[in-house]
């Protein structure tokens, strides 16, 4: 049975810590649905200054975070929905199977979405989802964004920093640059509905109508400790 978590929190640092904790400290298969207040999240191997308009983010009080999985930079806000799958597997997984789960969900809503070579998801050639993944021992984590009603102006501003003179050289040597794509919101392609409606549909679909599992007190304490010791630390966020 899969443990299904519908997170009541909206803190990017808590959620990144929760993912790492649940991956490394548990043995349950987990599905988690979550959202964050405005945040920019870069991959573990990315160079922050090449991916984020830091001055704009700080001025607009947009959080800047680094996750422990790879992949490119993404923008989160309360119009964006995030899905996380954590499973124990005896062999190297094919991550496209996780992508297909999301495509099947979108198909259930009448959306003819397609997957891309970098495990992105597209509607009419415009990106609505990016994903990343990582392995830990016999455990796998796959997570993705779903742009439902995101502030796309803020997204473009956050993820388009001023080019630096040495940016191309440094990025190619030391870090993994994001591949830019034109984006759209899912809401433009479905009958009118709120992001809450969309979240409910997503949770019901992936949880197979199982009940919501809450974080335990012990988990919250451990996750918050990891949040404080790692994810909010400048040494981690600005490590490249």
Label every PLM stretch briefly.
Residues 1-93:
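N-terminal lobe of the biotin/lipoate ligase/transferase fold
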């Amino acid at each position: 049975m899969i443990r299904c978590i519908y997170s009541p929190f909206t803190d990017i640092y808590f959620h990144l810590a929760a993912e790492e904790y649940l991956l490394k400290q548990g043995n349950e298969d987990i599905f988690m649905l979550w959202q964050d207040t405005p945040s920019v999240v870069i991959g573990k191997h990315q160079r922050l200054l090449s991916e984020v308009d830091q001055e704009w983010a700080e001025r607009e009080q947009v959080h800047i975070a680094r996750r422990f999985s790879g992949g490119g930079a993404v923008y989160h806000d309360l119009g964006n929905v995030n899905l996380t799958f954590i499973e124990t597997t005896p062999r190297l997984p094919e991550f496209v199977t996780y992508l297909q789960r999301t495509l099947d969900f979108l198909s259930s809503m009448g959306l003819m979405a397609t997957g891309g070579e970098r495990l992105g998801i597209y509607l009419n050639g415009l990106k609505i989802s990016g994903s990343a993944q990582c392995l830990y021992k016999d455990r796998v984590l796959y997570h993705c964004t779903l742009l439902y009603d995101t502030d796309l102006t803020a997204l473009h501003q956050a993820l388009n920093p001023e080019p630096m003179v040495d940016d191309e050289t440094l990025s190619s040597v030391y870090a993994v640059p994001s591949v830019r794509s034109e984006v759209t919101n899912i809401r433009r392609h479905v009958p009118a509905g709120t992001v809450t409606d969309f979240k409910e549909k997503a949770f019901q679909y992936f949880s197979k109508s199982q009940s919501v599992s809450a974080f335990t007190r012990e988990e919250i304490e451990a996750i918050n400790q990891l949040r404080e010791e790692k994810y909010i630390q400048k040494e981690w966020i600005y490590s490249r």
